[in-house]
Amino acid sequence: MLKRKLKPKRLQLPPQDVVFEGEAAMNEYTFYRNWVESWLQHIRSYYLLFIDGDPSLSKFFEIEICAHSWKRSTFDQQVFKFGLLWECVDIARSRTVYWQCALGTGHIQEDKVSEATSPFTDDSCTNSCLSRMTGQ
């Protein structure tokens, strides 16, 4: 999931009709050069991370994210990374309950948990697991 969310996107340069003639040449030497340099650094760090066989979770959040569009945005890297961290926690939590329920009923199901069949939507499974674990 983290690989997909942090994957670098292609740069979207501004159309030529939104810049003046002299501005286009100036942008080429200043804005575009720095932007492409930042984007290449993002790509480099992304692929160096995945060359490592088993990167730690903290390495995922050390990657600097580069803007891919020329339009102004209110994107905040820290909020984005915080959201990714909570998605990881939710996934880990749902799989933990899923495996506890599967082990508690005496059989293990190897299919992945989908959003529609999340163990959190089925309270009977969670309650039966809790009662077996506590012995009540």
UniProtKB/Swiss-Prot annotation:
The UniProt entry lists the main location of this chain as mitochondrion
| Gene Ontology CC annotations of this record | mitochondrion
Keywords for the protein's UniProt record, in alphabetical order = Mitochondrion
Where in or outside the cell it occurs: the entry states:
Mitochondrion
Reading the lineage from the top rank, the first entry is Eukaryota
Q: What else is known?
A: A stretch of 270 kb of the mitochondrial genome is duplicated within the centromere of chromosome 2 resulting in the duplication of the gene. The expression of this duplicated gene (At2g07691) is demonstrated.
> What is the name listed in the Swiss-Prot or TrEMBL entry for this protein?
Uncharacterized mitochondrial protein AtMg01310
Q: Native species of this protein? A: Arabidopsis thaliana
